Amino acid sequence: MKKQRNLRSMAAQAIEQVVEQGQSLSNILPPLQQKVSDKDKALLQELCFGVLRTLSQLEWLINKLMARPMTGKQRTVHYLIMVGLYQLLYTRIPPHAALAETVEGAVAIKRPQLKGLINGVLRQFQRQQDELLAEFNASDARYLHPSWLLKRLQKAYPEQWQSIVEANNQRPPMWLRVNRTHHSRDSWLALLDEAGMKGFPHADYPDAVQLETPAPVHALPGFEEGWVTVQDASAQGCMTWLAPQNGEHILDLCAAPGGKTTHILEVAPEAQVLAVDIDEQRLSRVYDNLKRLGMKATVKQGDGRYPSQWCGEQQFDRILLDAPCSATGVIRRHPDIKWLRRDRDIPELAQLQSEILDAIWSHLKSGGTLVYATCSVLPEENSLQIKAFLQRTADAELCETGTPEQPGKQNLPGAEEGDGFFYAKLIKK
Protein backbone atom coordinates (compact mmCIF):
# COMPACT_ATOMS: atom_id res chain seq x y z
CA MET A 1 0.00 0.00 0.00
CA LYS A 2 1.35 3.43 -0.97
CA LYS A 3 2.31 5.66 1.95
CA GLN A 4 0.91 9.13 1.42
CA ARG A 5 0.39 11.66 4.21
CA ASN A 6 0.58 15.40 4.68
CA LEU A 7 4.16 15.95 5.87
CA ARG A 8 3.50 19.52 7.02
CA SER A 9 0.78 18.49 9.45
CA MET A 10 2.93 15.60 10.72
CA ALA A 11 5.83 17.98 11.34
CA ALA A 12 3.54 20.49 13.08
CA GLN A 13 2.19 17.83 15.43
CA ALA A 14 5.70 16.56 16.23
CA ILE A 15 6.97 20.07 16.99
CA GLU A 16 3.93 20.72 19.19
CA GLN A 17 4.74 17.57 21.19
CA VAL A 18 8.31 18.80 21.75
CA VAL A 19 7.49 22.39 22.68
CA GLU A 20 4.21 21.93 24.54
CA GLN A 21 4.67 18.47 26.07
CA GLY A 22 8.44 18.28 26.53
CA GLN A 23 8.91 15.16 24.42
CA SER A 24 12.24 14.42 22.73
CA LEU A 25 12.34 14.64 18.94
CA SER A 26 14.59 11.56 18.82
CA ASN A 27 11.70 9.58 20.35
CA ILE A 28 8.91 11.15 18.27
CA LEU A 29 10.45 11.31 14.80
CA PRO A 30 11.46 7.69 13.96
CA PRO A 31 7.91 6.25 14.33
CA LEU A 32 6.56 9.10 12.18
CA GLN A 33 9.16 8.43 9.49
CA GLN A 34 7.94 4.83 9.27
CA LYS A 35 4.57 6.19 8.12
CA VAL A 36 5.93 8.00 5.06
CA SER A 37 7.67 6.95 1.85
CA ASP A 38 11.46 6.75 1.78
CA LYS A 39 11.75 9.89 -0.34
CA ASP A 40 9.69 11.86 2.22
CA LYS A 41 11.64 10.77 5.31
CA ALA A 42 14.39 13.35 4.76
CA LEU A 43 11.92 16.21 4.19
CA LEU A 44 9.98 15.35 7.35
CA GLN A 45 13.24 15.40 9.31
CA GLU A 46 14.29 18.69 7.72
CA LEU A 47 10.98 20.36 8.61
CA CYS A 48 11.10 19.17 12.24
CA PHE A 49 14.78 19.96 12.85
CA GLY A 50 14.61 23.22 10.91
CA VAL A 51 11.60 24.62 12.75
CA LEU A 52 13.10 23.71 16.14
CA ARG A 53 16.43 25.27 15.14
CA THR A 54 14.73 28.57 14.15
CA LEU A 55 11.78 28.48 16.56
CA SER A 56 12.57 31.88 18.13
CA GLN A 57 12.42 33.55 14.73
CA LEU A 58 9.22 31.80 13.64
CA GLU A 59 7.53 32.63 16.97
CA TRP A 60 8.60 36.27 16.61
CA LEU A 61 7.20 36.44 13.07
CA ILE A 62 3.86 34.90 14.06
CA ASN A 63 3.49 37.44 16.85
CA LYS A 64 3.98 40.19 14.27
CA LEU A 65 1.65 38.64 11.68
CA MET A 66 -1.25 37.63 13.94
CA ALA A 67 -3.29 39.75 16.34
CA ARG A 68 -3.96 36.83 18.74
CA PRO A 69 -2.10 33.56 19.36
CA MET A 70 -3.76 30.25 18.52
CA THR A 71 -4.78 28.42 21.69
CA GLY A 72 -6.48 25.22 22.83
CA LYS A 73 -7.43 22.75 20.11
CA GLN A 74 -6.27 25.20 17.45
CA ARG A 75 -2.71 25.23 18.81
CA THR A 76 -1.47 22.74 16.19
CA VAL A 77 -2.34 25.35 13.54
CA HIS A 78 0.19 27.69 15.21
CA TYR A 79 2.93 25.13 14.51
CA LEU A 80 1.59 24.43 11.03
CA ILE A 81 2.04 28.14 10.22
CA MET A 82 5.61 27.85 11.57
CA VAL A 83 6.24 24.96 9.17
CA GLY A 84 4.95 27.15 6.33
CA LEU A 85 7.16 30.09 7.31
CA TYR A 86 10.21 27.83 7.62
CA GLN A 87 9.72 26.52 4.08
CA LEU A 88 9.43 30.05 2.68
CA LEU A 89 12.54 31.20 4.53
CA TYR A 90 14.93 28.25 4.42
CA THR A 91 14.05 25.66 1.77
CA ARG A 92 14.16 25.43 -2.00
CA ILE A 93 10.54 24.27 -2.12
CA PRO A 94 8.75 26.58 -4.60
CA PRO A 95 6.64 29.07 -2.58
CA HIS A 96 3.38 28.08 -4.30
CA ALA A 97 3.97 24.41 -3.39
CA ALA A 98 4.96 25.26 0.19
CA LEU A 99 1.78 27.32 0.62
CA ALA A 100 -0.52 24.75 -0.99
CA GLU A 101 0.80 21.80 1.04
CA THR A 102 0.81 23.76 4.31
CA VAL A 103 -2.76 25.02 3.79
CA GLU A 104 -3.83 21.45 2.96
CA GLY A 105 -2.31 20.36 6.26
CA ALA A 106 -5.27 22.00 8.00
CA VAL A 107 -7.50 19.28 6.56
CA ALA A 108 -5.20 16.54 7.89
CA ILE A 109 -5.45 17.95 11.44
CA LYS A 110 -9.23 18.36 11.09
CA ARG A 111 -9.18 22.16 10.99
CA PRO A 112 -10.33 22.78 7.37
CA GLN A 113 -12.14 25.96 8.43
CA LEU A 114 -8.72 27.55 9.13
CA LYS A 115 -7.27 27.04 5.63
CA GLY A 116 -8.04 30.66 4.76
CA LEU A 117 -6.33 31.95 7.91
CA ILE A 118 -3.15 29.93 7.23
CA ASN A 119 -3.06 31.07 3.61
CA GLY A 120 -3.61 34.70 4.64
CA VAL A 121 -0.82 34.72 7.25
CA LEU A 122 1.72 33.13 4.89
CA ARG A 123 0.85 35.49 2.03
CA GLN A 124 1.08 38.47 4.36
CA PHE A 125 4.58 37.32 5.31
CA GLN A 126 5.55 37.14 1.63
CA ARG A 127 4.40 40.74 1.13
CA GLN A 128 6.16 42.10 4.25
CA GLN A 129 9.18 39.75 4.31
CA ASP A 130 11.96 42.32 3.82
CA GLU A 131 10.78 44.79 6.46
CA LEU A 132 9.92 42.03 8.96
CA LEU A 133 13.33 40.38 8.62
CA ALA A 134 15.12 43.72 8.98
CA GLU A 135 13.27 44.31 12.25
CA PHE A 136 13.90 40.74 13.43
CA ASN A 137 17.64 41.01 12.72
CA ALA A 138 17.83 43.95 15.13
CA SER A 139 16.09 42.02 17.95
CA ASP A 140 17.49 39.63 20.60
CA ALA A 141 15.38 36.86 19.07
CA ARG A 142 17.93 36.70 16.21
CA TYR A 143 20.21 34.54 18.36
CA LEU A 144 17.62 31.70 18.18
CA HIS A 145 18.20 30.69 21.83
CA PRO A 146 15.94 30.97 24.90
CA SER A 147 16.88 33.96 27.06
CA TRP A 148 17.89 31.89 30.12
CA LEU A 149 20.46 29.94 28.08
CA LEU A 150 21.73 33.06 26.35
CA LYS A 151 22.37 34.66 29.77
CA ARG A 152 24.27 31.61 31.01
CA LEU A 153 26.44 31.52 27.86
CA GLN A 154 27.15 35.26 28.08
CA LYS A 155 28.20 34.91 31.72
CA ALA A 156 30.39 31.83 31.16
CA TYR A 157 31.93 32.94 27.85
CA PRO A 158 31.92 36.76 27.62
CA GLU A 159 34.29 36.68 24.61
CA GLN A 160 32.99 33.55 22.87
CA TRP A 161 29.23 33.33 23.45
CA GLN A 162 28.34 34.64 20.01
CA SER A 163 30.49 32.07 18.22
CA ILE A 164 28.94 29.32 20.41
CA VAL A 165 25.45 30.50 19.49
CA GLU A 166 26.36 30.66 15.80
CA ALA A 167 27.78 27.12 15.90
CA ASN A 168 24.65 25.86 17.69
CA ASN A 169 22.51 27.27 14.87
CA GLN A 170 24.42 25.46 12.10
CA ARG A 171 23.70 22.05 10.63
CA PRO A 172 26.18 19.55 12.09
CA PRO A 173 28.73 17.65 9.99
CA MET A 174 28.61 13.86 9.90
CA TRP A 175 31.45 12.20 11.79
CA LEU A 176 32.31 8.51 11.67
CA ARG A 177 34.52 6.23 13.72
CA VAL A 178 36.48 3.59 11.81
CA ASN A 179 36.61 0.25 13.64
CA ARG A 180 40.36 -0.32 13.95
CA THR A 181 39.83 -4.06 14.52
CA HIS A 182 38.65 -4.30 10.88
CA HIS A 183 40.43 -1.50 9.01
CA SER A 184 42.98 1.23 9.40
CA ARG A 185 41.48 4.66 8.87
CA ASP A 186 43.44 5.11 5.63
CA SER A 187 42.29 1.77 4.18
CA TRP A 188 38.64 2.56 4.99
CA LEU A 189 39.00 6.04 3.46
CA ALA A 190 40.18 4.33 0.27
CA LEU A 191 37.00 2.19 0.29
CA LEU A 192 34.95 5.34 0.82
CA ASP A 193 36.66 6.94 -2.17
CA GLU A 194 35.87 3.87 -4.30
CA ALA A 195 32.21 4.26 -3.28
CA GLY A 196 32.27 7.80 -4.71
CA MET A 197 32.33 9.64 -1.36
CA LYS A 198 34.95 11.83 0.27
CA GLY A 199 36.07 11.87 3.89
CA PHE A 200 38.69 13.73 5.92
CA PRO A 201 40.67 12.41 8.91
CA HIS A 202 40.61 14.29 12.22
CA ALA A 203 43.99 15.71 13.23
CA ASP A 204 43.85 14.51 16.87
CA TYR A 205 41.47 11.55 17.09
CA PRO A 206 42.92 8.52 15.26
CA ASP A 207 39.65 6.79 14.29
CA ALA A 208 37.62 9.88 13.31
CA VAL A 209 36.52 10.68 9.75
CA GLN A 210 34.36 13.61 8.65
CA LEU A 211 32.22 13.03 5.57
CA GLU A 212 32.34 15.81 3.01
CA THR A 213 28.58 15.34 2.53
CA PRO A 214 26.32 13.51 5.03
CA ALA A 215 25.10 10.16 3.68
CA PRO A 216 22.68 7.42 4.75
CA VAL A 217 24.46 4.79 6.84
CA HIS A 218 23.53 1.94 4.46
CA ALA A 219 25.60 3.70 1.76
CA LEU A 220 28.78 3.57 3.90
CA PRO A 221 31.26 0.77 3.06
CA GLY A 222 30.92 -2.03 5.62
CA PHE A 223 28.43 -0.32 7.93
CA GLU A 224 26.32 -3.46 8.40
CA GLU A 225 29.51 -5.48 8.93
CA GLY A 226 30.62 -3.15 11.74
CA TRP A 227 33.51 -1.47 9.96
CA VAL A 228 32.30 2.01 10.85
CA THR A 229 30.04 3.77 13.39
CA VAL A 230 28.40 7.19 13.40
CA GLN A 231 29.90 9.17 16.30
CA ASP A 232 30.90 12.80 16.67
CA ALA A 233 34.63 13.53 16.85
CA SER A 234 34.36 15.12 20.30
CA ALA A 235 32.68 12.00 21.72
CA GLN A 236 35.55 9.94 20.28
CA GLY A 237 37.95 12.11 22.28
CA CYS A 238 36.92 10.24 25.45
CA MET A 239 39.17 7.32 24.44
CA THR A 240 42.21 9.61 24.25
CA TRP A 241 41.87 10.27 27.98
CA LEU A 242 40.52 6.88 29.08
CA ALA A 243 43.25 4.91 27.21
CA PRO A 244 41.72 1.46 27.87
CA GLN A 245 44.05 -1.57 27.92
CA ASN A 246 43.50 -5.26 27.19
CA GLY A 247 42.73 -7.37 30.25
CA GLU A 248 41.40 -4.49 32.34
CA HIS A 249 38.01 -4.30 34.05
CA ILE A 250 36.34 -1.18 32.70
CA LEU A 251 33.03 0.43 33.63
CA ASP A 252 31.12 2.51 31.10
CA LEU A 253 28.54 4.33 33.23
CA CYS A 254 25.54 6.07 31.63
CA ALA A 255 26.48 3.98 28.60
CA ALA A 256 23.44 4.14 26.29
CA PRO A 257 23.29 4.13 23.32
CA GLY A 258 26.64 2.31 23.42
CA GLY A 259 28.91 4.35 21.15
CA LYS A 260 31.61 4.66 23.79
CA THR A 261 31.16 1.06 24.99
CA THR A 262 31.98 -0.24 21.53
CA HIS A 263 34.84 2.26 21.13
CA ILE A 264 36.43 0.89 24.32
CA LEU A 265 36.25 -2.61 22.81
CA GLU A 266 37.70 -1.45 19.50
CA VAL A 267 40.70 0.05 21.32
CA ALA A 268 41.04 -2.82 23.82
CA PRO A 269 39.27 -5.94 22.44
CA GLU A 270 40.36 -8.08 25.42
CA ALA A 271 39.02 -5.68 28.07
CA GLN A 272 36.21 -6.83 30.39
CA VAL A 273 33.58 -4.11 29.95
CA LEU A 274 30.48 -3.49 32.06
CA ALA A 275 28.01 -1.07 30.42
CA VAL A 276 25.39 0.41 32.76
CA ASP A 277 22.53 2.82 32.13
CA ILE A 278 19.44 3.78 34.13
CA ASP A 279 17.17 3.75 31.06
CA GLU A 280 16.17 0.19 30.19
CA GLN A 281 14.66 1.22 26.84
CA ARG A 282 17.86 2.92 25.69
CA LEU A 283 19.89 -0.15 26.69
CA SER A 284 18.36 -1.97 23.72
CA ARG A 285 20.50 0.28 21.52
CA VAL A 286 23.63 -0.82 23.42
CA TYR A 287 22.75 -4.44 22.56
CA ASP A 288 22.10 -3.44 18.92
CA ASN A 289 25.49 -1.71 18.64
CA LEU A 290 27.34 -4.63 20.22
CA LYS A 291 25.60 -7.07 17.89
CA ARG A 292 26.34 -5.08 14.72
CA LEU A 293 30.01 -4.78 15.68
CA GLY A 294 30.27 -8.42 16.81
CA MET A 295 31.40 -7.49 20.34
CA LYS A 296 30.67 -8.73 23.85
CA ALA A 297 30.16 -6.74 27.02
CA THR A 298 28.12 -7.18 30.19
CA VAL A 299 25.11 -4.86 30.02
CA LYS A 300 23.05 -3.92 33.10
CA GLN A 301 20.29 -1.52 34.03
CA GLY A 302 21.23 0.52 37.07
CA ASP A 303 21.31 3.89 38.81
CA GLY A 304 24.77 5.46 38.96
CA ARG A 305 24.08 6.80 42.46
CA TYR A 306 23.74 3.26 43.87
CA PRO A 307 26.51 1.15 42.28
CA SER A 308 26.47 -1.57 44.94
CA GLN A 309 23.02 -2.57 43.63
CA TRP A 310 24.45 -3.61 40.25
CA CYS A 311 28.15 -4.34 40.83
CA GLY A 312 28.38 -5.27 44.51
CA GLU A 313 31.87 -4.42 45.78
CA GLN A 314 33.55 -4.76 42.36
CA GLN A 315 36.51 -2.48 41.64
CA PHE A 316 37.45 -1.21 38.18
CA ASP A 317 40.76 -0.28 36.55
CA ARG A 318 39.08 2.45 34.54
CA ILE A 319 35.70 4.17 34.67
CA LEU A 320 34.13 6.30 31.96
CA LEU A 321 31.35 8.45 33.41
CA ASP A 322 29.50 10.13 30.55
CA ALA A 323 27.37 12.03 33.03
CA PRO A 324 23.71 13.00 32.53
CA CYS A 325 23.81 16.68 31.54
CA SER A 326 22.03 19.60 29.88
CA ALA A 327 23.40 18.57 26.45
CA THR A 328 24.03 22.25 25.69
CA GLY A 329 27.09 21.25 23.63
CA VAL A 330 25.07 19.27 21.08
CA ILE A 331 22.28 21.75 20.28
CA ARG A 332 23.27 21.85 16.60
CA ARG A 333 22.66 18.09 16.49
CA HIS A 334 19.53 18.14 18.71
CA PRO A 335 17.88 21.57 18.39
CA ASP A 336 14.95 20.46 20.55
CA ILE A 337 17.30 20.71 23.56
CA LYS A 338 16.85 24.50 23.51
CA TRP A 339 13.14 24.05 24.20
CA LEU A 340 13.24 20.93 26.40
CA ARG A 341 15.68 22.34 28.98
CA ARG A 342 14.80 24.91 31.66
CA ASP A 343 17.09 27.10 33.74
CA ARG A 344 16.09 25.21 36.89
CA ASP A 345 17.39 21.95 35.34
CA ILE A 346 21.02 23.04 35.64
CA PRO A 347 21.42 22.95 39.46
CA GLU A 348 19.40 19.71 39.56
CA LEU A 349 21.71 18.09 36.98
CA ALA A 350 24.82 19.36 38.80
CA GLN A 351 23.55 17.76 42.03
CA LEU A 352 22.90 14.45 40.24
CA GLN A 353 26.38 14.49 38.66
CA SER A 354 27.93 15.18 42.05
CA GLU A 355 26.09 12.25 43.66
CA ILE A 356 27.13 9.84 40.89
CA LEU A 357 30.78 10.95 41.07
CA ASP A 358 30.92 10.44 44.84
CA ALA A 359 29.19 7.05 44.65
CA ILE A 360 31.28 5.57 41.86
CA TRP A 361 34.68 6.80 43.10
CA SER A 362 34.81 4.05 45.75
CA HIS A 363 34.59 1.46 42.94
CA LEU A 364 37.79 2.71 41.25
CA LYS A 365 41.01 0.83 42.10
CA SER A 366 43.97 2.71 43.56
CA GLY A 367 46.00 4.00 40.62
CA GLY A 368 42.93 3.71 38.41
CA THR A 369 41.59 6.29 35.96
CA LEU A 370 38.16 7.92 35.91
CA VAL A 371 37.20 10.07 32.93
CA TYR A 372 34.31 12.42 33.62
CA ALA A 373 32.68 13.61 30.39
CA THR A 374 29.63 15.66 29.43
CA CYS A 375 28.23 17.10 26.21
CA SER A 376 27.60 20.38 28.04
CA VAL A 377 29.29 23.77 27.79
CA LEU A 378 28.09 25.05 31.19
CA PRO A 379 30.75 25.41 33.94
CA GLU A 380 28.33 24.28 36.67
CA GLU A 381 28.31 20.81 35.10
CA ASN A 382 31.96 20.80 34.07
CA SER A 383 34.92 22.70 35.53
CA LEU A 384 33.06 23.81 38.68
CA GLN A 385 31.77 20.26 39.20
CA ILE A 386 35.28 18.79 39.03
CA LYS A 387 36.81 21.58 41.11
CA ALA A 388 34.33 20.85 43.92
CA PHE A 389 34.96 17.10 43.64
CA LEU A 390 38.74 17.56 43.91
CA GLN A 391 38.30 19.77 46.98
CA ARG A 392 36.22 17.17 48.84
CA THR A 393 38.03 14.02 47.62
CA ALA A 394 41.50 13.65 49.13
CA ASP A 395 42.62 10.70 46.98
CA ALA A 396 41.56 12.26 43.64
CA GLU A 397 44.16 13.86 41.41
CA LEU A 398 43.63 15.72 38.12
CA CYS A 399 45.72 14.35 35.26
CA GLU A 400 46.59 15.92 31.87
CA THR A 401 43.33 17.90 31.63
CA GLY A 402 43.55 21.47 32.88
CA THR A 403 44.67 22.78 36.28
CA PRO A 404 43.16 22.48 39.79
CA GLU A 405 41.96 26.09 39.44
CA GLN A 406 40.47 25.46 35.97
CA PRO A 407 40.08 21.69 35.74
CA GLY A 408 39.16 19.78 32.61
CA LYS A 409 39.30 20.32 28.87
CA GLN A 410 36.36 22.12 27.27
CA ASN A 411 35.67 21.73 23.55
CA LEU A 412 33.25 24.37 22.28
CA PRO A 413 30.66 23.63 19.58
CA GLY A 414 32.14 23.87 16.10
CA ALA A 415 35.78 23.83 17.27
CA GLU A 416 37.55 21.50 14.81
CA GLU A 417 34.04 20.76 13.50
CA GLY A 418 33.17 18.78 16.66
CA ASP A 419 30.37 19.07 19.21
CA GLY A 420 30.69 20.88 22.53
CA PHE A 421 32.24 18.43 25.00
CA PHE A 422 34.01 18.42 28.37
CA TYR A 423 36.54 15.91 29.70
CA ALA A 424 38.35 15.60 33.03
CA LYS A 425 40.80 12.77 33.69
CA LEU A 426 41.12 11.83 37.36
CA ILE A 427 43.58 9.39 38.94
CA LYS A 428 42.99 7.67 42.29
CA LYS A 429 46.08 8.08 44.46
Swiss-Prot record:
The record's listing under SUPFAM superfamilies reads: NusB-like, S-adenosyl-L-methionine-dependent methyltransferases
* Localization per Swiss-Prot or TrEMBL: Cytoplasm
What top-tier enzyme class does this entry carry?
transferase
Q: What reaction does this catalyse?
A: cytidine(967) in 16S rRNA + S-adenosyl-L-methionine = 5-methylcytidine(967) in 16S rRNA + S-adenosyl-L-homocysteine + H(+)
* InterPro entries assigned to the protein according to its UniProt record, in alphabetical order: MeTrfase_RsmB-F_NOP2_cat, MeTrfase_RsmB-F_NOP2_dom, NusB-like_sf, NusB_RsmB_TIM44, RCMT, rRNA_ssu_MeTfrase_B, rRNA_ssu_MeTfrase_B_ent, RsmB-like_ferredoxin
Q: Which CDD domains match?
A: AdoMet_MTases, Methyltransferase_Sun
GO CC annotation terms, alphabetical:
cytosol
Q: What is its main location?
A: cytoplasm
Pfam families for the chain: Methyltr_RsmB-F, NusB, RsmF-B_ferredox
Role noted for this protein: Specifically methylates the cytosine at position 967 (m5C967) of 16S rRNA.
Q: Which family does it belong to?
A: Belongs to the class I-like SAM-binding methyltransferase superfamily. RsmB/NOP family.
Q: What is this protein called?
A: Ribosomal RNA small subunit methyltransferase B
What organism does this protein naturally occur in? Answer: Escherichia coli O81 (strain ED1a)
